[in-house]
């Protein structure tokens, strides 16, 4: 009882004597104000050099470019190809008369892949204690977590 009281009082004494070391140390405490001002000036200069998106290409210039190119672009042609549903060749049935991802083909492919995953032999057993090599060593020596599986 006496030694634990001395230990606790000593720890409390250290906690009150060393407040800077027991508190949180913020990252910005190690950066000087001069460095922060230099960084702020650098950011301001970069912002001045980089034009805003609205200022970079005025809307009048865009409309003039569209008129020069012919008919104005439709909203669908502005979308990237990966955003669309399917491309026109797939929508019309492709070259061979049917799309490459017809629903029955796709479901059959997914079923076969799932079946292959479920029936595939497990090359590595699950072990919560050791890796594969340690399991083999443990099995031969009687040590390890999975040694009960290898009894002969």
UniProtKB/Swiss-Prot annotation:
Keyword Cytoplasm among UniProt keywords: no
GO cellular component: cell projection; cytoplasm; extracellular space; perikaryon; protein-containing complex
Propeptide segments, given as residue ranges: 25-122, 92-102
Site (Cleavage): 122-123, 129-130
UniProt xrefs under InterPro entries: Natr_peptide, Natr_peptide_CS, Natriuretic_peptide, Natriuretic_peptide_atrial
UniProt xrefs under SMART domains: NAT_PEP
Chain intervals for the UniProt region annotation (Disordered): 58-101
First and last residue of the signal peptide: 1-24
Disulfide bond sites: 129-145
Record PTM text: The precursor molecule is proteolytically cleaved by CORIN at Arg-122 to produce the atrial natriuretic peptide. Undergoes further proteolytic cleavage by unknown proteases to give rise to long-acting natriuretic peptide, vessel dilator and kaliuretic peptide. Additional processing gives rise to the auriculin and atriopeptin peptides. In the kidneys, alternative processing by an unknown protease results in the peptide urodilatin.
Region feature (Important for degradation of atrial natriuretic peptide by IDE): 146-150
Residues with the Phosphoserine modification: 128
Domain of life the protein comes from: Eukaryota
Keywords: Cell projection, Disulfide bond, Hormone, Phosphoprotein, Secreted, Signal, Vasoactive, Vasodilator
Family: Belongs to the natriuretic peptide family.
Protein name stated in the entry: Natriuretic peptides A
Native source organism of the sequence: Bos taurus
């Amino acid at each position: 009882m006496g030694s634990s009281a001395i230990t606790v009082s000593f720890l409390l004494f250290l906690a009150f004597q060393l407040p800077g070391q027991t508190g949180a140390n913020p990252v910005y405490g190690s950066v000087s104000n001069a460095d922060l001002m230099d960084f702020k000036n650098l950011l301001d200069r970069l912002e001045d050099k980089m034009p805003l998106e609205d200022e970079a290409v005025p809307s009048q210039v865009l409309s003039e470019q569209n008129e020069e190119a012919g008919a104005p672009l439709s909203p669908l042609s502005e979308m990237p190809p990966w955003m669309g549903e399917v491309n026109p060749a797939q929508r019309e049935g492709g070259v061979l008369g049917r799309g490459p991802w017809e629903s029955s083909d796709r479901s059959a492919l997914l079923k076969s892949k799932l079946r292959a995953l479920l029936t595939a032999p497990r090359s590595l057993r699950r072990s919560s204690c050791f890796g594969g090599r340690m399991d083999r060593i443990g099995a031969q020596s009687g040590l390890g977590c999975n040694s009960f599986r290898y009894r002969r």
